Amino acid sequence: MKIVAAEFVTSAVNPGGYPPGNLPEVAFVGRSNVGKSSLINKVVNRKGLAKTSSTPGRTQLINFFNINNDQFLMVDLPGYGYAKVPTDVRIKWGKMIEGYLKERECLKGVVLLIDSRHTPTAQDKQMYEWLQYYHVPTVVVATKVDKLSNNQWAKQQAVIKKSLPLSKEHQLISFSAETGRGKEKLLKVLDEFIHKDGINLTAIE
């Protein structure tokens, strides 16, 4: 896949604000400050498309981006796990994220971002288990690998795979928004996602 166009569509807090749902969607999810916006910008070759912030917990909306003139939508979900956000807000975000992932019929796959420098958090593990439980096509992307040496990444790769634990059917892609490492691999996965059949979560339940 080659991305030649990317445009912001809308922001939403509930299904009433979502786009119509006539295009395949791929969602990006991860804890606060994991580098989600930077990854999206790198993948679509647009520096300011997804708003980046040095303040964790800043993204409070579900943001939709149209890719390649209606080929599919990228969906940027709010970051989870930021302790300084009030409890009621964290609960609201959790319901917002789960509601989208569970109810969105045009969802084709999820990109779960994990900071390559750290052991997956309890929230990371919970999200991964949830996606597995509902059989949502998933790829795990380890961000900020440019901060690690090759030896450090080799060790962290093993830690991440063991901690989740990573299913054999799921890939772990090392990614750097600085160098572009992992971009082509991720684009290939996105292409595979949007050509899959739909996910019927209601039927699974």
Curated annotation (Swiss-Prot):
Residue ranges constituting the EngB-type G domain according to the UniProt record: 22-196
GO biological process terms held by the UniProt record: division septum assembly
Record has DNA-binding as a keyword: no
GO annotations of cellular component type: cytosol
Any matching Pfam family: MMR_HSR1
UniProt KW keywords: Cell cycle, Cell division, GTP-binding, Magnesium, Metal-binding, Nucleotide-binding, Septation
Alphabetical list of PANTHER family matching this protein: ENGB-TYPE G DOMAIN-CONTAINING PROTEIN (PTHR11649:SF13), MSS1/TRME-RELATED GTP-BINDING PROTEIN (PTHR11649)
Species for this entry: Desulforamulus reducens (strain ATCC BAA-1160 / DSM 100696 / MI-1) (Desulfotomaculum reducens)
Name listed for the protein in its UniProt record: Probable GTP-binding protein EngB
Family: Belongs to the TRAFAC class TrmE-Era-EngA-EngB-Septin-like GTPase superfamily. EngB GTPase family.
Lineage of the species this protein comes from: Bacteria, Bacillati, Bacillota, Clostridia, Eubacteriales
Biological role stated in the UniProt entry: Necessary for normal cell division and for the maintenance of normal septation.
Obligatory cofactor(s): Mg(2+)
UniProt: Mg(2+) binding residues: 37, 59
Entry keyword annotation includes GTP-binding: yes
GO terms of molecular function: GTP binding; metal ion binding
